Amino acid sequence: MVNGALNQRCRSDYWACKGDVRPLSARNDVLVFQTSPLQADLEVTGRLIVKLWASSSAPDTDFTAKLTDVYPPSNDFPTGVDLNVADSIIRARYRTSREKSELMTPGQVYEFTIEMYPTSLVFKKGHRIRVDISSSNFPRFDVNPNTGEPLNRNRRWAVATNSIYHDPQHPSHIELPVIPATK
């Protein structure tokens, strides 16, 4: 993570937020999975991998994943703090290989693997663990035009409608390397 963790809330003075200071997880283009407050400290150490089963209306799009440590409200931070632990992205055209581009058939379900940087963190009792799935994490990653045109030479932009699947045939999940607590 370049420059360390960032609070996952927009600032009213940031041009991309347009005065909206809600948490990024409150956006309607972010799929959120969040635990209840943890009953005990939980150590996560190692590689973080997200497996997604997804389809898109576009021939190319991005899928992003972000692991967040959600701090409860406190005197210093009355609304709490949402600190990103790790994040990453997969461009659909490179879902099977970074060397060979392969566009999607719109509406077809594909498996995607998003590998985040390894981490070592103890999520403290009372905190929540959150995973955000989206199709963009700008400005950290460049925007996908969703058209399938050659990268950086696109002449048009398209809105992609993406679907994430989570059922026995399409088990989307995150692999968290939990280290058992010692007594």
Task: For each feature predicted by the language model, list its residue ranges.
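Intrinsically disordered, low-complexity Ser/Thr/Gly-rich stretches
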Residues: 1-183
